[in-house]
């Protein structure tokens, strides 16, 4: 899915999805060290940022597209800055009741005392971040909740600082193989 023609260097969220996708599925290339947590997996890339900002389609539309291509694991690192249980949270919960063999991993945001939607859905895995050199300390910007209802926040945490992963260059025909380090 693409709402436009790819990453736009003019937007502040340029490269975000590419970097996260690389952290999940990257494999070694031309001697570059690094491997994603599910290296050699296949990817359905759903571009939800255009030159004006976020413009994501309805979550049920994205999930239906995933199902049509056989994807059962979902990774979302976006949402709205609200702790409310939204229609998107509800649709994710409904989806996972109807398609119980699928699972979504969702970043809860960048405010430690909050847990933003859709990571507050009840049938997903909320993923917080730790410092890279010490897996027991949460990254200072990692959301962890609790939820608006007072429920626990993250299900799991993963290193979130200094991650070397894929780098977008904004050129659709470059066959870019660059890497970058980021949070």
Q: How should each PLM-predicted stretch be described?
A:
Residues 1-56, 72, 82-85, 99-101, ...:
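Subtilisin-like serine protease catalytic core
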Residues 6, 132-138, 160-183:
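The feature captures the short pre-catalytic strand/loop hairpin that immediately precedes
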Residues 17, 59-60, 88-92, 138:
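Amphipathic alpha-helical segments in well-structured domains
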Residues 25-29, 67, 93-100, 129-132, ...:
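Sec-exported extracytoplasmic/periplasmic mature domains
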Residues 55-64:
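Short, acidic/polar
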Residues 63-89, 106-108:
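Short acidic, glycine-rich surface-loop motifs adjacent to enzyme active sites
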Residues 76, 104-108, 129, 158, ...:
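General beta-strand structural signal in soluble alpha/beta enzymes
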Residues 79-81, 107-113, 132-133, 162:
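Catalytic metal-binding/acid-base residues of hydrolase active sites
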């Amino acid at each position: 899915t693409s709402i436009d023609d790819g990453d736009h260097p003019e937007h502040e969220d340029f490269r975000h999805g590419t970097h996260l996708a690389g952290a999940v599925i990257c494999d070694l290339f031309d001697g570059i060290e690094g491997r994603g947590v599910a290296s050699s997996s296949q990817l359905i890339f759903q571009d939800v940022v255009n030159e004006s900002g976020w413009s994501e389609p309805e979550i049920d539309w994205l999930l239906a597209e995933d199902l049509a291509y056989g994807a059962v694991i979902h990774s979302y690192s976006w949402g709205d800055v609200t702790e409310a249980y939204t229609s998107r949270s509800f649709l994710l919960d409904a989806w996972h009741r109807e398609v119980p063999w699928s699972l979504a991993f969702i970043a809860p945001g960048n405010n430690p005392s909050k847990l933003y939607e859709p990571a507050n859905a009840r049938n997903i895995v909320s993923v917080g971040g730790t410092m890279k050199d010490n897996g027991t300390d949460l990254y200072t910007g990692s959301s962890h909740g609790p939820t608006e209802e007072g429920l626990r926040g993250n299900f799991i945490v993963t290193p979130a600082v200094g991650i070397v992963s894929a780098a977008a260059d904004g050129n659709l025909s470059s066959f870019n193989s660059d890497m970058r380090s980021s949070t």
